[in-house]
């Protein structure tokens, strides 16, 4: 018996008879979810997820998408089809002439501690990201912000220095509670181990190195989540995660492509899902410290002709990935006219003769 569960912009499959597994790869992630397995001791209302460890949880500082999106909520969100939808903000407008965004918050927004969430919290969050002392990992996304004002508790106005087509997407960032963090050093605040957000789940316990337990937040703006409790069980090793999936100690986990074959043999017990990610791997050349690249600036592109990306995907990722020609993944803004410098040994020889005369 299966039913769909909608959880913070993600649709998962819940099953009472089947375990669901997940595979994580460099460019494609295979994701799974299960409420319980036939051999599992886990409560039917509890999801146990095999997770990497955390030392701090704070969306303004660190990019921990999985747990951040459960504990915190942003002004905007992405639905199951990755389309931008209203979240804490019920609507917004953009003035192209002045590069100004105006977001209107929903009525009755609450943090997990029962305090009101207002436009001042939004302003505080963005200013915390921009504060150089905080060394935020995501500051580059918000550097176009010129000014932030709060005409009232439900309205925040953000003026940019120039057009930024991705800005509404960047506003999926989780909003921090100003009343808990004002005047404190964000990087060392106790808050990072006891986070309070406005997302669908609130943190109830953190056993360092062992597990992080979240329980549903009844005051969540989008309604009560269907799953009562989510346990992030710390299992760093992917082989160990696979074994615990099979034993029923985990309901959901990310594993590597090479482990997919063993799960396919147990296909009756596991559901496997694949999901594209923005993750990529690359070789970065040292332009600043190399006279060679200064003399021959076109050399980096020439070297790209010698990299068989398709072969790497087939051998290293067992086909679970896609070719990346830049740090930015293919999406709705993708241009098919861009020169990709795809694998072509003949072009290397041609350029060698042109550059070096041999």
Predicted features and spans:
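Structural transition elements
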Residues: 20, 323-358
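A structural "hinge/loop" feature
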Residues: 50-68, 88, 115, 167-176, ...
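Gly/Pro-rich hinge or "lid" segments in bacterial periplasmic/extracellular proteins
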Residues: 79, 83, 172-225, 229
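Ligand-site clamp/hinge motif
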Residues: 218-263
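Aromatic- and charge-enriched surface segment that lines or borders ligand/interaction sites
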Residues: 90-135, 157, 293, 300
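Periplasmic-binding protein-like
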Residues: 293-332, 352
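N-terminal lobe/hinge region of extracytoplasmic solute-binding protein
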Residues: 50-96, 127, 196
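Surface-exposed binding/hinge segments that line
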Residues: 93, 97, 139-181
């Amino acid at each position: 018996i299966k039913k769909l569960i909608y959880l913070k912009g993600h649709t998962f499959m819940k099953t009472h008879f089947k375990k669901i597994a997940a595979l994580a790869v460099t460019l494609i992630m295979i994701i799974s979810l299960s409420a319980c397995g036939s051999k599992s001791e886990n409560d039917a209302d509890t999801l146990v997820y095999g997770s990497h460890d955390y030392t701090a949880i704070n969306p303004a500082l660190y990019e921990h998408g999985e747990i951040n999106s459960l504990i915190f909520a942003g002004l905007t969100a992405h639905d199951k089809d990755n389309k931008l939808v209203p979240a804490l903000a019920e609507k917004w407008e953009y003035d192209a002439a002045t590069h100004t965004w105006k977001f209107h918050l929903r009525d009755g927004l609450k943090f997990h501690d029962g305090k009101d969430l207002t436009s001042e919290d939004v302003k505080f969050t963005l200013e915390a990201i921009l504060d150089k002392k905080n060394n935020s990992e995501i500051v580059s996304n918000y550097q176009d912000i010129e000014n932030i004002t709060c005409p009232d508790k439900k309205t925040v106005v953000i003026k940019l220095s120039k057009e930024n087509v991705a800005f509404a997407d960047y506003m999926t960032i989780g909003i921090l509670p100003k009343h808990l963090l004002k005047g404190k050093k964000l990087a060392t605040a106790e808050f990072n181990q006891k986070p309070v957000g406005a997302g669908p789940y609130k943190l109830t316990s953190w056993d360092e190195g062992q597990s992080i337990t979240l329980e549903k937040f009844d005051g969540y703006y989008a309604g009560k989540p269907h799953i009562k409790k989510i346990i992030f069980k710390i299992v760093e090793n992917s082989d160990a995660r696979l074994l615990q999936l099979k034993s029923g100690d985990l309901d959901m986990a990310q594993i590597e492509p090479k482990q997919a074959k063993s799960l396919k043999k147990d296909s009756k017990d596991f559901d496997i899902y694949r999901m594209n990610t923005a993750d990529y791997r690359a070789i970065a050349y040292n332009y600043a410290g190399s006279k060679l690249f200064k003399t021959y600036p076109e050399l980096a592109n020439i070297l790209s002709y010698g990299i068989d990306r398709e072969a790497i995907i087939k051998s290293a990722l067992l086909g679970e990935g896609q070719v990346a020609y830049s740090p930015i993944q293919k999406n709705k803004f993708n241009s098919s006219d861009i020169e990709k410098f795809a694998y072509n040994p003949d072009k290397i020889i041609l350029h060698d003769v042109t550059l070096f005369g041999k």
